[in-house]
Amino acid sequence: MIQGGGLDTDLIEKPSRDPIINEADNGRSNAIGTIAMARTSDPNSASSQFFINVADNDFLNHPDKTQHGWGYAVFADVVEGMEVVNHIKSVATGSERYHRDVPSELIEITEIHISNAYDQY
């Protein structure tokens, strides 16, 4: 997976809004090309970090409403530009300060497009 949001390009935490309620029981699965909310071990802690699934990650799906069963809420799909996602996936990573898997080159999302295509689910 590729995780983003929450940190600026200097790996400093950005201000975020209050956490949201986990909606992983929405019927969506963490399949390749989906985008989901990242969170801590608290099921209702997602705020500004997200991840793009670069593989089918069924183990992240919602099996039940227990502490370990909540899963991760899928809220969007990559509908165009999966080749960009695959390029990001191929970038070498390392550790920087207390962060792991930091890309060796700056990767920054500068533009996204939101559509109502999600209404079909």
Question: Where are the regions that the model predicts?
Answer:
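Cyclophilin-like peptidyl-prolyl cis-trans isomerases
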Residues: 1-121
